[in-house]
């Protein structure tokens, strides 16, 4: 899966060929989760602190993430600082 961001040990990936709803994946050590782009609802197992960091990162990038999903053009996004 193409990596679109990395911060605090969390790797964010997006694969637009997957099932709906539009979502992205996050990995943190042995933990894996997917996040709905529109609602940021999480599916999977992730530590609470890491989950909050992913949501904090994703909130200002929701429009860009959805555009990537729909256009099938993946680009890197800035990390959470």
Describe each model-derived feature in a short phrase:
Residues 1-20:
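Short, charged/polar N-terminal "headpieces" of proteins
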Residues 3, 33, 42, 73-76:
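Glycine-rich, flexible loop/turn motifs
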Residues 7-8, 24, 69:
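Aromatic side chains
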Residues 15-48:
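A short, structured beta-strand/loop element
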Residues 52-81:
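C-terminal structural segments of small proteins and small subunits
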């Amino acid at each position: 899966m193409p990596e679109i961001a990395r911060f605090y040990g969390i790797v964010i990936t997006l694969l637009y060929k997957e099932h709906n709803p539009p979502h992205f994946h996050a990995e943190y050590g042995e933990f894996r989760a997917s996040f709905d782009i529109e609602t940021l609802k999480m599916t999977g197992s992730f530590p609470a602190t890491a989950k909050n960091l992913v949501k904090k990162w994703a909130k200002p990038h929701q429009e860009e993430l959805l555009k990537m999903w729909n256009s099938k053009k993946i680009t890197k996004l800035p990390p959470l600082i």
